[in-house]
Regions:
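A membrane-topology feature that recognizes alpha-helical transmembrane segments
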Residues: 1-156
Length: 156
């Protein structure tokens, strides 16, 4: 079996399992626990590094690290600029998602990152139109980040 294929499968399976867990937790509690997000980031960094060693090609690792910094930085800026907007868990999850999406390529990164905001906006508009939310209603964003990441991986 090709080592790269095995590592990609490990990343996809792990991200999907952890993503579902985090989406459920965030939807219920508006929290993305450090005890899940941070070990996930560490393990994905190890897998990306193993991929770089196994393939003798560090380009995907470098792209993944840059993607983590860019998306994490963007979410951190949103957190600083909006008082009740993004939570700290969203910022840390953005590091994980940025790493995985950019590891796959910039197309996956752009599609996944933008899809999260589009999906979250549509959901918020539906809630507003149905009278189930107002401008002050807090909406968990983690599920939309994860859904966007899945779309990015599948479509990017």
């Amino acid at each position: 079996m090709d080592i790269r294929l095995a590592l990609v499968g490990l990343v996809h399976g792990g991200l999907l399992a952890v993503g579902i867990l985090l989406a459920v937790i965030d939807a219920r509690t508006h929290r993305l626990p450090n005890r899940i997000v941070l070990p996930t980031l560490f393990l994905l960094l190890l897998v990306a590094a193993a991929d770089a060693v196994a393939t003798a090609d560090a380009a995907a690792l470098g792209r993944g690290l840059l993607g983590a910094l860019v998306l994490g930085g963007f979410y951190a800026a949103l957190r600083l600029l909006s008082r009740a907007g993004m939570g700290g868990g969203d910022v840390k999850l953005a590091l994980v998602i940025g790493l995985v999406l950019a590891w796959h390529g910039w197309g996956a990164f752009l599609l996944g990152a933008s899809s999260a905001f589009a999906l979250g906006a549509v959901y918020a508009l539906v809630l507003l139109a149905a009278g189930r939310a107002d401008r002050r209603t807090r909406i968990a964003f983690g599920p939309w980040m994860i859904a966007g990441a899945v779309l990015g991986v599948l479509g990017g």
